[in-house]
Amino acid sequence: MNRVIYPGTFDPITKGHGDLVERAAKLFDHVIIAVAASPKKNPLFSLDKRVELAREVTRHLPNVEVLGFSSLLAQFAREQKANALLRGLRAVSDFEYEFQLANMNRQLAPEVESLFLTPSEKYSYISSTLVREIAALGGNIEQFVHPAVADALRERFRA
């Protein structure tokens, strides 16, 4: 069974992330969205809320599972018996960091391959950071995120 992990902070999960998950679900038997705790990034949403939102966005995909994690990614991949890590590349600027990360993960878990997908053109400019900034300033985020995520962002910035 081909099991792929798609790791990230997903703060929040965007339509760009969803696009990659949909495509991965067609390529792999089982897709695990691994939501990283990432305390150093000081996420807007709690780990539990980010997991909940990712589950809502992907509930129509039977071979997709969403799990939170706070360990080393290579260790988590082994625990989940994954044979691949999936990363998205939006632009050339993402490549250098992702290349270093892939090489480090190869050293830590040589049995787990790193694979890259580029987003559909209509999502290539979307980032969680930009979505948070637009939401914080009261802008329209509906075109960038699932309705449940838009609701969560509006509620968060109302508080």
Swiss-Prot record:
InterPro entries: Cyt_trans-like, PPAT, Rossmann-like_a/b/a_fold. It comes from the Bacteria. It is found in: Cytoplasm. Its EC number is 2.7.7.3. Its cofactor is Mg(2+). GO terms for biological process: coenzyme A biosynthetic process. ATP binds at T9, F10, H17, G88, L89, R90, E98, Y123, S124, Y125, I126, S127, S128, T129. It catalyses: (R)-4'-phosphopantetheine + ATP + H(+) = 3'-dephospho-CoA + diphosphate. Pfam families: CTP_transf_like (PF01467). GO terms for cellular component: cytoplasm. GO terms for molecular function: ATP binding; pantetheine-phosphate adenylyltransferase activity. The keyword Magnesium applies. It is an enzyme of class 2 (transferase). Its main location: cytoplasm. The keyword ATP-binding applies. Pathway: Cofactor biosynthesis; coenzyme A biosynthesis; CoA from (R)-pantothenate: step 4/5. The record marks H17 as: Transition state stabilizer. Keywords: ATP-binding, Coenzyme A biosynthesis, Cytoplasm, Magnesium, Nucleotide-binding, Nucleotidyltransferase, Transferase. Substrate binds at T9, K41, L73, R87. Belongs to the bacterial CoaD family. Homohexamer. Reversibly transfers an adenylyl group from ATP to 4'-phosphopantetheine, yielding dephospho-CoA (dPCoA) and pyrophosphate. This is Phosphopantetheine adenylyltransferase.
